[in-house]
Regions:
Chain A
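Glycine-rich phosphate-binding loops of nucleotide-dependent enzymes
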Residues: 2-253
């Protein structure tokens, strides 16, 4: 099978991040092509979340270079990256817990449209309509006026995913989007994500522990171990890789 | 669309009825209880604006300020200094109080928002102490500990009752603007950063910028309150920027109830009443006041506003937020 060639959307060169003595990322080189659905897998503590946060600009003191569409984004703040087209979710979902679901989504659209300085009700109403529409798409309309704090974990994750989509990001970074969901929910969400990525031609980088989901959704897979990249390839190559099997069998789960 | 209409339009009538009722009640007290009643009403109203300005920061921005009196004091002094040192006519000087407070909020805020949580709070305290010290020690300009007095007829010569009514109108305008801020895109941004700055950042907000905007708005309205206070008494003292007023504002907001727009309003009402009446009844008023506050907080963990909301809910009279 030939890989469709398209421009590199993300390039990491020599990424290194330490927490005190501990090396969380050790000289990581990584390429991501536009339109890929790229899975990042590896045992606990491998550095997957750290890598995602490096790309999203959320970690201080990172050595090396990150290029987004050919431009060095190493010095940009997370909010600047968001406006340049990088959207993300967090491993432990982050939403505005005291607000309603609709308010959360409206906030995401207000921020994405960069109209947060506005005092106008009309501006709010316009973004609220977009938000209500997104809630319909991700199936949370019924919950619109409930506080996020009262939502089960899976729905919070779904909401956070919808919020990350508000800015229509070119690169979507999802850190364990299905953690805490039932198997059925997982496949449901990730099928939806994959469909959306394919339909819009955007790029997806996601961390996922459920190997079935990975093999079904991903077009490429990168395996991380102890702060470095072990191997990168198609799902079929990764599934057949002896080293990868050893890492996963050697793990407690 | 439907959902929005159903939620937002229906209670609007009730909200307006509530506001009209509150204004009528205060005005009745103002007109029917003589000079002392009018003075009390005026003080309550000024404190409502002051506490509500802090409430914007605390309830919506989740920013705890330990130095909010700085902007109250700057409001008083901006007004008083404009008259005494720059010969601005007193009516025109009214704008310089909130203006100076806003500028103070911009300068100190830019410093404070670089830190978060308790470190933020400590910085606001430090900024307020700097303000207090400058007001206290710069004799040639601020009059030092003797303050600024005798630069105007208190209340512009208005009767106590008329001043209270005028203050009420101004307070209504201030509260309406704050209400609009909270329920605008800006308000949503302020709440977003308050609840999860990392999520807000990942969505494209600069947390510091949002917090600075909130800080300046808050300082401005504290300055309005401070200016009104200076007009009320016809003077300005360093204490207006001191720990006493900072503490009063904090107590009013917490007593009134965090996470509620009317928290500052209820807190100002009840706390000012307590502070005025408890000392008349007992010599150990500070102890009694403390016990009453403790009791209220224990009975109503969400503050007075939360208690009122619950009571309204029991009476089938919801949507008092
Ligand atoms: N703030 C921090 N301070 C110190 N060590 C940290 C910090 N954050 C992460 N680490 C360590 O860095 C290593 C990599 O963490 P990271 O969260 O990137 O792993 P991960 O691959 O996402 O694992 P998981 O599958 O458990 O989410 C871990 O050993 C973790 O303990
Ligand atoms: Mg992780």
């Amino acid at each position: 099978m030939t890989q469709l060639r398209s421009d590199l959307i993300l390039t990491a060169r020599g990424l290194r991040k330490t927490y005190g003595q501990f090396v969380a990322l050790n000289d990581v080189n990584f390429d991501l092509r536009g339109g890929e659905k790229h899975a990042l897998i590896g045992p606990n503590g491998a550095g997957k979340s750290t890598f995602i946060s490096c790309v999203a600009g959320q970690l201080p003191g990172v050595e090396g270079a990150v290029l987004f569409r050919g431009r060095d984004i190493g010095s940009l703040r997370p909010h600047q990256l968001a406006h340049r087209g990088i959207g993300r979710t967090f491993q432990i979902s982050r939403t505005f817990l005291q607000m309603t679901v609709l308010e959360n989504m409206t906030a995401a659209y207000v921020i994405a449209a960069d109209s947060w300085t506005s005092l106008r009700r009309r501006v709010l109403a316009r973004q609220q309509d977009k938000a209500a529409n997104m809630l319909r798409i991700i199936g949370l309309s019924q919950r619109a006026h409930e506080r996020v704090l009262d939502l089960p974990l899976g729905e919070r994750k779904r909401l956070e995913f919808g919020m990350a989509l508000a800015g229509d990001p070119d690169l979507l970074l999802l850190d364990e989007p299905t953690a805490g969901m039932s198997i059925k929910e997982r496949h449901h969400l990730m099928d939806f994500v994959a469909e959306r990525i394919d339909a819009t031609g955007k790029t997806l980088l996601f961390v996922e522990h459920d190997i079935d989901v990975v093999l079904k959704i991903a077009s490429r897979v990168t395996v991380m171990v102890r702060g470095g990249i072990l191997v990168e390839g198609t799902p079929a190559e990764i599934a057949a890789n002896k080293e990868v099997q050893a890492v996963y069998l050697g793990e407690a789960h | 669309m439907m959902a929005r209409l159903a939620r937002a339009e229906m209670p609007r009538l009730r909200q307006m009825l509530f506001v009209a009722g509150a204004v009528a009640a205060l005005e009745a007290v103002n007109r029917l209880t003589g000079v002392s009643g009018s003075l009390l009403v005026a003080e309550i109203i000024i404190m409502m604006v002051f506490a509500s300005s802090l409430n914007l920061l605390m309830s919506f921005g989740h920013m705890v300020s330990f130095g909010h009196a700085a902007y109250f004091g700057l409001g008083s002094y901006g007004f008083a200094l404009a008259i005494t040192r720059f010969d601005v006519p007193a009516e025109a000087a009214l704008v310089f109080g909130p203006l100076l407070a806003g500028i103070g909020g911009l300068v100190f805020g830019a410093l404070c928002v670089r830190l978060t949580e308790i470190y933020f709070a400590m910085l606001t305290l430090a900024c307020a102490q700097i303000t207090y010290t400058v007001l206290f020690q710069w004799y040639d300009f601020t009059g030092g500990d003797t303050g600024l007095t005798g630069f105007m007829t208190p209340r512009f010569g208005l009767s106590e009752a008329n001043f209270a009514s005028a203050a009420m109108v101004l307070a209504l305008v201030c509260l309406y603007v704050l209400w609009r801020v909270v329920h605008s895109p800006l308000g949503l941004a302020i709440r977003s950063v308050g609840q999860d700055r990392y999520r807000a950042e990942a969505l494209g907000l600069s947390p510091r910028r949002v917090q600075l905007v909130a800080f300046v708005i808050s300082a401005f309205f504290a300055g309005v309150a401070g200016t009104l206070f200076a007009v009320f008494h016809g003077n300005a003292f360093p204490d207006y920027a001191g720990l006493g007023f900072t503490l009063d504002a904090l107590i009013m907001v917490v007593l009134g109830g965090l996470n509620s727009f009317l928290g500052g309003v209820w807190g100002a009402l009840v706390y000012t009443l307590l502070k005025n009446f408890v000392p008349l009844m007992t010599a150990h008023w500070e102890l009694i006041l403390g016990l009453i506050l403790l009791a209220i907080v224990l009975v109503m963990p969400h503050g007075l506003a939360g208690g009122v909301k619950r009571l309204a809910g029991m009476l089938g009279w919801g949507a008092l937020r």
